[in-house]
Amino acid sequence: MPIFFYLFTTLIIISSLCVVLSKNSVYSVLWLIFAFINGSGLMILLGAEFLAMMLIVIYVGAVAVLFLFVIMMLDMHFNKAIMQLKEKPILSIFVSLIMFADLVVIILLGTKNIHFSSDLSFAIASDVSNTKAIGKILYTDFMIPFQIAGLILFVAMIGCITLTLRKRDGVKRQNIAKQLSHNKENAVLMTKPLINKGIENIKYE
């Protein structure tokens, strides 16, 4: 079904460009969800129904929704960051060129030993399920890249936790040690307020 392949591919490219070019971060996440849905359509065309379902359940149902909640909850000043990048155009261009060169090298090295065919699908053994084929390859030939990917995700999780633990002005925090050290002598304050003064002369620690 070449028409569906080109349809899903075109929609993925358009939605990916919208993810990068959208000024509103919430819209970027919505376009990212749309790209994941079209990617699952490609997986179905290739006969990998398990991967298509995992792409919907994990990426759309968990990761993309998590991105949406994080962006809406954290106070991210994207406009301020964009203005800082505009003040340093040389640095921005240099970083962009490095990332572009990195992508070119990855594409060239990744497609060096691949023999393309006119057929858009590939042969899958009928007696082997998607999960068995993925597990056999993932935990044998790609064992080290799989562990490295897990380590990268672990570092990203630590970074997210660090972002949420930043100190904010005006937020009252508990002092557990001070609360536990209270006794009956310092927990209750006995005082005798002056007439017509109320509690103005009372000092609290």
Curated annotation (Swiss-Prot):
- Compartments where found: Cell membrane
Name of one Pfam family that matches: Oxidored_q3
Coarse class of the protein's main subcellular location: membrane
Which major enzyme category is it?
translocase
Leader sequence range is none
Q: Which sequence ranges form a coiled-coil region, renumbered to this chain?
A: none
Which InterPro entries does the protein's record reference?
Answer: NADH_UbQ/plastoQ_OxRdtase_su6 (IPR001457), Nuo/plastoQ_OxRdtase_6_NuoJ (IPR042106)
Per the UniProt entry, the Enzyme Commission number(s) are 7.1.1.-
Q: Which GO terms describe its molecular function?
A: NADH dehydrogenase (ubiquinone) activity; quinone binding
Q: Which UniProt keywords apply?
A: Cell membrane, Membrane, NAD, Quinone, Translocase, Transmembrane, Transmembrane helix
Instruction: Specify the domain of life of the species encoding this protein.
Output: Bacteria
General function of this protein: NDH-1 shuttles electrons from NADH, via FMN and iron-sulfur (Fe-S) centers, to quinones in the respiratory chain. Couples the redox reaction to proton translocation (for every two electrons transferred, four hydrogen ions are translocated across the cytoplasmic membrane), and thus conserves the redox energy in a proton gradient.
NCBIfam families in the record, alphabetically?
PRK06638.1-4 (NF005164)
What family is this protein classified in? Belongs to the complex I subunit 6 family.
Q: What is this protein called?
A: NADH-quinone oxidoreductase subunit J
